[in-house]
A protein has these predicted regions:
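Nucleotide-sugar donor-binding catalytic core of glycosyltransferases
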Residues: 1-166
Length: 166
């Protein structure tokens, strides 16, 4: 099966995908302009308004509004101008998608990165993989959950019990 080729303009390579080790079945990222559609991701989103390639051009706000608020704010404040320059926007923020016709919902892929997927023996009812990130409110809530249930759950991650292939 042939893959659909996107020109990817992103600060990350997204290799093999936007979810680390989960290789896309239908998409191939092209970093040299050989694809059929241009996709400007998160921190490169504003570069899309200067695209003169003539190819369909989209912005993908892959990160949440809490992580890249300045890009969401600029795009939404200048929505009519941005939409006059591109073909559409993808976002994982449902409230933004409901409010703006040109913004489509695109779920952020958070598939597990576990290489050897199986059901492992547990010492407690629930296990959780968590990081110590504190970049937004959701991160803080996760860490509050960790503190509250520290003795009732098995925690894994860089800070707790590091695993090499999460």
């Amino acid at each position: 099966m042939s893959k659909f080729k996107f020109n990817l303009y992103c600060n990350d390579t997204l290799e093999p995908s936007s979810s680390d080790k989960n290789t896309p079945k239908y998409v191939e990222w092209d970093y040299h302009g050989g694809g059929d559609v241009n996709l400007y991701v998160s921190q490169r989103a504003l570069d899309a308004i200067n695209d003169t390639s003539g190819k369909p051009t989209y912005i993908w706000l892959l990160e949440s509004r809490q992580i890249i608020p300045q890009f969401y704010d600029w795009v939404l404040t200048n929505y009519d101008f941005v939409m006059s320059r591109i073909d559409g926007i993808f976002s994982c923020d449902e409230s933004v998608c409901e409010k703006y016709e040109g913004i489509s919902y695109g779920i952020t892929n958070a598939a597990p990165w576990v290489v050897d997927r199986q059901i492992y023996k547990k010492t407690k009812l629930v296990s959780m993989i968590a990081s110590n990130k504190r970049m937004c409110e959701g991160h803080a809530k996760r860490l509050q959950f960790v503190d509250k249930f520290r003795d009732k759950l098995d925690f894994y991650g860089r800070v707790f019990n590091e695993i090499s292939c999460k």
